[in-house]
């Protein structure tokens, strides 16, 4: 399912962003 893949990529992206904010 394409939507599922997009959702997973988005989750991965936001997860990295949150990690970056917490790292600072």
Swiss-Prot record:
Signal sequence extent: none
Coiled-coil intervals: none
Main location: secreted
Compartment list: Secreted
Tissue-by-tissue expression: Expressed by the dorsal and submental skin glands.
Keyword Transferase: no
Gene Ontology annotations of biological process type: defense response
Keyword Chaperone attributed: no
GO cellular component, as recorded: extracellular region
Keywords: Amphibian defense peptide, Secreted
Record protein name field: Citropin-3.1.2
Species of provenance: Ranoidea citropa
């Amino acid at each position: 399912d394409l939507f599922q893949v997009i959702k997973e990529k988005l989750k991965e992206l936001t997860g990295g962003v949150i990690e970056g904010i917490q790292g600072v």
